Amino acid sequence: MKEVELQNSIVTYLEYTGMLFTCTLGGVFLGKSNWKQKRMLSKHYSKGVPDILIFEPSNNDKYDGLMVELKVGYNKPTKEQKEWIAKLNARNYKAIVCKSLEQFIEIINAYKNETI
């Protein structure tokens, strides 16, 4: 499975739940010579921001939102992604890496119940 396919599955699930969320531009960049990428980066887009940002507090307000970095197969978070995850976790958000739709659903349930 490709990361974009995983993201599409998760977006479909999130739309069904009615949660407030958005996806970042992580996968749109095509190379260093791409003029669109250079223009976006000149507008202060940050490398490493998680793929899915969910703007829903956990049930007892332990967390203000859930930020999910998607990885498939043997892929691992980059240095910048790890830094963003650490910064978000230090600021009352829950940021986590996810590798499958099944894992995502488990994460959502644990997030809502504040068991993660």
Predicted segments — roles?
Residues 1-116:
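Catalytic phosphate/metal-binding cores of nucleic-acid and nucleotide-processing enzymes, i.e., regions
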